[in-house]
Design a protein with these regions (language model features):
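Transmembrane signal-anchor hairpin modules in multi-pass inner-membrane enzymes, especially those
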Residues: 1-90, 117-127, 131, 188-202, ...
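Membrane-interface micro-motifs in multi-pass membrane enzymes
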Residues: 28-36, 100-104, 165-181, 222, ...
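Alpha-helical transmembrane segments of multi-pass inner-membrane proteins
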Residues: 86, 126-157, 169-241, 259-265
Length: 360
């Protein structure tokens, strides 16, 4: 390459940074931006550009990357998830829906490319990426918390009727993102590996405590249960590995005390628990319609019925909506549907045994 060539290192970092910015912003607002950001980051890591006037040369290392895919099962598993959904289109009659689901699964195809090349990305960039995500989540949480404080009575009553705290995206997805942020912050605090300034540690401790309080305020069961399971697994591995049995027992007691304290101190969580207990009593009376948790359980029952009817191949991802409608109508004489609220059952029902295998 002659002296007029420009090193790609000066270009790819800007695309990678763009991808990180889109991901951190889209995490709270748009799944499309999340998918697009992964594609951009993947492209920035596997494409090499050389500008040699008057030509622009583009090179890729896909052949080399293809060989690397076989060195780590996680890469193949992610690609397998995408391929299973893609292949199920062969027996799907509703092609538009199949295309939609396939497009949503594209990140599983590109993510391994990012993971293969992520080692070439400076560590501070990765740290900065997670900081961007957590900062974005923090700012949206401030808006949610401010709204809750202003309308706490109305929101608590709304939760008692099966509603949820208003969030910019699905409240279930949002709460899980909060739980993951808490676990990332905890890792930074415990390992003390990523701090460049002394005051950073105190910022992470503040955010850790703040998000723990916040996740109980928004009172979404998926996020709270996921958080407690994550905390239990993390500290179980960390403490038992170092043979600290007393501290492990203290950790269990701490989680128990935290849950009891949150129930008694956070009105929204108390309302959520009360509503959950009440709707199960209604279910015992044979009522299920318009009760959020019970509707999810019914959706799982309908999903299992679909699995029973299509145990090997599934319906095909494109036909899952129509088959679900037919199943609801046949079993419950009801036209409003929900997809099976369990990823294992949904994947099995839509893509058959291969779909079930792909997420194990």
């Amino acid at each position: 390459m002659n002296n007029s060539a420009i090193n790609y290192q000066g270009y790819y970092k800007y695309f990678f940074i763009l991808g990180m910015l889109l991901f951190s912003f889209g995490l709270n607002w748009s799944m499309f931006l999340v998918s697009l950001s992964i594609i951009i980051m993947a492209a920035s890591l596997i494409v090499k550009i050389e500008i040699t006037k008057p030509f622009v040369s583009i090179y890729t290392k896909w052949g080399y990357d293809f060989k690397l895919l076989f060195k780590d099962p996680i890469y193949l598993i992610l690609i397998f998830v995408f391929l299973v959904n893609l292949i199920s289109g062969l027996w799907s009659e509703e092609k538009p829906l199949w295309i939609w689901f396939t497009r949503m699964m594209l990140p599983f195809l590109f993510l391994p490319m990012v993971m293969i090349r992520i080692g070439t990305v400076p560590r501070k960039w990765i740290h900065g990426f997670w900081l961007l995500c957590i900062s974005s989540i923090f700012f949206t949480s401030i808006w949610i918390l401010f709204d809750y404080i202003q309308h706490s009575q109305e929101i608590n009553e709304f939760i008692m009727k099966g509603g949820a705290v208003k969030t910019p995206i699905s409240h279930i997805r949002y709460s899980i993102i909060i739980a993951c942020s808490i676990l990332i912050l905890m890792q930074w605090i415990v390992k003390n590996e990523v701090f460049e300034k002394k005051f950073e540690r105190w910022i992470y401790i503040f955010l850790f405590i703040y998000f723990i309080i916040f996740i109980h305020i928004i009172s979404v069961k998926s996020g709270i249960i996921g958080l407690y399971i994550g905390l239990f697994i993390y500290w179980t591995f960390y403490l038992l590995k170092n043979k600290k049995m007393i501290q492990w027992l203290a950790m269990i007691a701490t989680l128990f005390i935290l849950s009891i304290a949150a129930y008694n101190l956070v009105p929204s969580l108390k309302s959520k628990v009360a509503y959950t207990v009440w709707q199960y009593s209604e279910w015992q009376k044979g009522k299920w319609l318009y009760y959020s948790d019970i509707e999810r359980l019914v959706s799982i029952q309908m999903g299992l019925q679909i699995v029973k009817n299509f145990p090997i191949s599934g319906t095909g991802i494109g036909d899952i909506e129509q088959v679900t409608k037919d199943t609801y109508y046949e079993c419950l004489n009801h036209k409003e549907i929900k997809y099976a609220h369990n990823q294992f059952i949904f994947s099995w029902a839509a893509c058959g045994l291969l779909g079930l295998l792909s997420i194990f």
